[in-house]
Amino acid sequence: MAAAATIEHVVLFKVRDSTDPSKVDAMVSNLRSLASLDVVAHLAAGPVLPRPHRSATGFTHLLHSRYRSKADLAAYSTHPTHAAVVEENVLPVCEDIMAMDWVADLDSPTAAPPGSAMRLTLAKPKEGATAELTATLAQVKLSAPAAVTQVSYGENFSPARAKGYGVGLLAVFRDLEELEAMDAGEKDLVESVKEKVRPLLESFIVVDFEVPPPPAATL
Protein backbone atom coordinates (compact mmCIF):
# COMPACT_ATOMS: atom_id res chain seq x y z
CA MET A 1 0.00 0.00 0.00
CA ALA A 2 1.38 3.44 -0.93
CA ALA A 3 2.13 5.74 1.98
CA ALA A 4 -0.54 8.36 2.63
CA ALA A 5 -0.11 11.54 4.66
CA THR A 6 -2.22 11.39 7.80
CA ILE A 7 -2.58 13.91 10.60
CA GLU A 8 -1.99 12.40 14.04
CA HIS A 9 -3.62 14.02 17.08
CA VAL A 10 -2.90 12.69 20.57
CA VAL A 11 -4.11 14.08 23.88
CA LEU A 12 -3.06 12.94 27.35
CA PHE A 13 -5.33 13.62 30.32
CA LYS A 14 -4.58 13.51 34.03
CA VAL A 15 -7.84 12.97 35.90
CA ARG A 16 -8.00 14.19 39.49
CA ASP A 17 -7.78 11.34 41.99
CA SER A 18 -10.91 12.54 43.77
CA THR A 19 -13.11 12.41 40.66
CA ASP A 20 -16.32 10.40 40.85
CA PRO A 21 -15.88 7.29 38.63
CA SER A 22 -19.17 8.05 36.87
CA LYS A 23 -17.75 11.38 35.70
CA VAL A 24 -14.63 9.65 34.41
CA ASP A 25 -16.81 7.18 32.52
CA ALA A 26 -18.83 10.08 31.09
CA MET A 27 -15.65 11.80 29.92
CA VAL A 28 -14.42 8.68 28.13
CA SER A 29 -17.83 7.92 26.63
CA ASN A 30 -18.27 11.44 25.29
CA LEU A 31 -14.74 11.57 23.91
CA ARG A 32 -15.37 8.31 22.07
CA SER A 33 -18.60 9.71 20.63
CA LEU A 34 -16.55 12.29 18.71
CA ALA A 35 -15.57 9.48 16.32
CA SER A 36 -18.93 10.11 14.63
CA LEU A 37 -17.89 13.56 13.37
CA ASP A 38 -17.46 13.58 9.60
CA VAL A 39 -13.96 15.06 9.70
CA VAL A 40 -12.62 12.29 11.94
CA ALA A 41 -10.90 9.40 10.14
CA HIS A 42 -10.21 7.44 13.34
CA LEU A 43 -10.68 8.10 17.04
CA ALA A 44 -10.11 6.02 20.16
CA ALA A 45 -10.08 7.07 23.80
CA GLY A 46 -9.70 5.35 27.14
CA PRO A 47 -7.43 4.74 30.12
CA VAL A 48 -3.71 4.28 29.69
CA LEU A 49 -2.42 0.91 30.84
CA PRO A 50 -0.70 0.87 34.24
CA ARG A 51 3.05 0.61 33.75
CA PRO A 52 4.93 1.46 36.98
CA HIS A 53 8.28 1.44 35.17
CA ARG A 54 7.12 3.79 32.41
CA SER A 55 7.57 7.56 32.39
CA ALA A 56 3.92 8.60 32.04
CA THR A 57 4.12 11.56 34.49
CA GLY A 58 0.77 10.71 36.01
CA PHE A 59 -1.38 10.83 32.89
CA THR A 60 -4.37 8.54 33.23
CA HIS A 61 -6.21 8.66 29.89
CA LEU A 62 -5.41 9.07 26.21
CA LEU A 63 -7.25 10.16 23.09
CA HIS A 64 -5.77 9.22 19.72
CA SER A 65 -7.36 10.42 16.50
CA ARG A 66 -6.43 10.76 12.85
CA TYR A 67 -7.46 13.18 10.11
CA ARG A 68 -7.05 13.40 6.36
CA SER A 69 -5.72 16.97 6.50
CA LYS A 70 -4.77 19.78 8.86
CA ALA A 71 -8.00 21.50 7.81
CA ASP A 72 -10.01 18.52 9.07
CA LEU A 73 -8.14 18.63 12.39
CA ALA A 74 -8.89 22.35 12.68
CA ALA A 75 -12.56 21.69 11.92
CA TYR A 76 -12.64 19.02 14.63
CA SER A 77 -10.98 21.33 17.15
CA THR A 78 -13.55 24.09 16.62
CA HIS A 79 -16.60 21.85 16.17
CA PRO A 80 -19.35 22.75 18.67
CA THR A 81 -19.77 19.12 19.72
CA HIS A 82 -16.06 18.81 20.50
CA ALA A 83 -16.08 22.12 22.36
CA ALA A 84 -19.05 20.99 24.46
CA VAL A 85 -17.37 17.71 25.44
CA VAL A 86 -14.21 19.53 26.48
CA GLU A 87 -16.12 22.15 28.46
CA GLU A 88 -18.64 19.84 30.12
CA ASN A 89 -16.83 16.52 30.51
CA VAL A 90 -13.07 17.06 30.32
CA LEU A 91 -12.06 20.31 32.01
CA PRO A 92 -14.12 19.75 35.19
CA VAL A 93 -12.34 16.46 36.00
CA CYS A 94 -8.78 16.94 34.66
CA GLU A 95 -5.89 18.60 36.43
CA ASP A 96 -3.52 18.37 33.48
CA ILE A 97 -3.82 17.99 29.70
CA MET A 98 -1.23 17.93 26.95
CA ALA A 99 -1.58 17.40 23.21
CA MET A 100 0.58 16.90 20.14
CA ASP A 101 -0.04 16.81 16.40
CA TRP A 102 2.19 15.58 13.61
CA VAL A 103 2.07 14.53 9.97
CA ALA A 104 2.70 10.82 9.40
CA ASP A 105 3.18 8.77 6.25
CA LEU A 106 1.17 5.61 6.87
CA ASP A 107 1.55 2.55 4.66
CA SER A 108 -1.29 0.67 6.35
CA PRO A 109 -4.93 1.44 7.18
CA THR A 110 -5.73 4.63 9.09
CA ALA A 111 -8.00 3.00 11.67
CA ALA A 112 -6.33 0.86 14.33
CA PRO A 113 -8.53 -2.24 14.87
CA PRO A 114 -10.19 -2.77 18.26
CA GLY A 115 -7.94 -4.84 20.48
CA SER A 116 -4.78 -3.34 19.00
CA ALA A 117 -2.18 -2.13 21.47
CA MET A 118 -0.34 1.16 21.09
CA ARG A 119 2.82 2.52 22.61
CA LEU A 120 2.97 6.30 22.45
CA THR A 121 6.25 8.10 23.06
CA LEU A 122 6.40 11.88 23.30
CA ALA A 123 9.94 13.23 23.18
CA LYS A 124 11.46 16.55 24.15
CA PRO A 125 14.65 16.74 22.07
CA LYS A 126 17.73 18.53 23.27
CA GLU A 127 18.34 21.86 21.62
CA GLY A 128 19.29 21.35 17.99
CA ALA A 129 18.65 17.59 18.06
CA THR A 130 15.18 17.43 16.47
CA ALA A 131 16.37 16.66 12.94
CA GLU A 132 18.74 13.93 14.14
CA LEU A 133 16.01 12.42 16.31
CA THR A 134 13.49 12.23 13.46
CA ALA A 135 16.15 10.69 11.21
CA THR A 136 16.85 8.10 13.90
CA LEU A 137 13.14 7.32 14.20
CA ALA A 138 13.00 6.76 10.44
CA GLN A 139 15.59 4.01 10.91
CA VAL A 140 13.64 2.62 13.87
CA LYS A 141 10.58 2.36 11.64
CA LEU A 142 12.51 0.40 9.02
CA SER A 143 13.88 -2.04 11.61
CA ALA A 144 10.66 -2.50 13.60
CA PRO A 145 10.01 -6.13 14.64
CA ALA A 146 7.24 -8.14 12.99
CA ALA A 147 4.96 -7.65 16.01
CA VAL A 148 4.71 -3.95 15.13
CA THR A 149 2.00 -3.51 12.51
CA GLN A 150 2.41 0.24 12.09
CA VAL A 151 4.87 2.96 13.07
CA SER A 152 4.04 6.65 12.96
CA TYR A 153 6.38 9.47 13.91
CA GLY A 154 6.78 13.15 13.25
CA GLU A 155 7.57 16.62 14.49
CA ASN A 156 4.84 18.38 16.45
CA PHE A 157 3.23 21.32 14.64
CA SER A 158 0.97 22.48 17.52
CA PRO A 159 3.27 23.63 20.34
CA ALA A 160 0.69 25.46 22.48
CA ARG A 161 -0.31 22.44 24.59
CA ALA A 162 2.75 20.23 24.11
CA LYS A 163 4.79 21.42 27.13
CA GLY A 164 7.92 21.60 24.99
CA TYR A 165 7.65 18.04 23.65
CA GLY A 166 8.46 18.24 19.97
CA VAL A 167 8.41 14.73 18.46
CA GLY A 168 5.84 11.95 18.65
CA LEU A 169 6.26 8.22 17.99
CA LEU A 170 3.38 5.76 17.88
CA ALA A 171 3.89 2.01 17.50
CA VAL A 172 0.84 -0.19 16.89
CA PHE A 173 0.75 -3.90 17.77
CA ARG A 174 -1.81 -6.56 16.86
CA ASP A 175 -2.73 -6.91 20.52
CA LEU A 176 -1.45 -6.35 24.04
CA GLU A 177 0.17 -9.78 24.17
CA GLU A 178 2.32 -8.91 21.14
CA LEU A 179 3.47 -5.68 22.79
CA GLU A 180 4.36 -7.43 26.04
CA ALA A 181 6.07 -10.25 24.14
CA MET A 182 8.26 -7.70 22.36
CA ASP A 183 9.27 -6.18 25.68
CA ALA A 184 10.20 -9.62 26.98
CA GLY A 185 11.70 -11.17 23.85
CA GLU A 186 13.25 -8.25 21.97
CA LYS A 187 15.18 -6.70 24.84
CA ASP A 188 18.35 -6.30 22.78
CA LEU A 189 16.46 -4.45 20.05
CA VAL A 190 14.63 -2.25 22.55
CA GLU A 191 17.86 -1.39 24.34
CA SER A 192 19.56 -0.66 21.02
CA VAL A 193 16.86 1.87 20.15
CA LYS A 194 17.12 3.46 23.59
CA GLU A 195 20.89 3.80 23.23
CA LYS A 196 20.43 5.64 19.93
CA VAL A 197 17.79 8.11 21.09
CA ARG A 198 18.66 8.80 24.74
CA PRO A 199 21.59 11.15 23.96
CA LEU A 200 19.20 13.25 21.86
CA LEU A 201 16.50 13.66 24.51
CA GLU A 202 15.96 16.09 27.33
CA SER A 203 12.96 14.07 28.54
CA PHE A 204 10.24 11.73 27.28
CA ILE A 205 6.83 10.31 28.15
CA VAL A 206 5.76 6.74 27.33
CA VAL A 207 2.23 5.36 27.65
CA ASP A 208 0.62 2.11 26.51
CA PHE A 209 -2.99 1.97 25.37
CA GLU A 210 -5.42 -0.66 24.13
CA VAL A 211 -7.85 0.34 21.36
CA PRO A 212 -11.40 -0.22 22.65
CA PRO A 213 -14.38 -1.47 20.64
CA PRO A 214 -16.20 1.29 18.72
CA PRO A 215 -19.04 3.02 20.56
CA ALA A 216 -22.43 1.36 20.12
CA ALA A 217 -24.61 3.02 17.52
CA THR A 218 -27.56 5.01 18.84
CA LEU A 219 -30.94 4.82 17.13
Regions found by a protein language model. Give the residues of each.
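A short beta-strand-loop micro-motif that forms or neighbors metal/cofactor-
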Residues: 89
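A short mixed-secondary-structure module that forms the rim of ligand-binding clefts
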Residues: 78-82, 86
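Short S/T/G/P-rich N-terminal loop/turn motif that feeds into the first structured element of a domain
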Residues: 1-64, 68-78, 92-191, 195-219
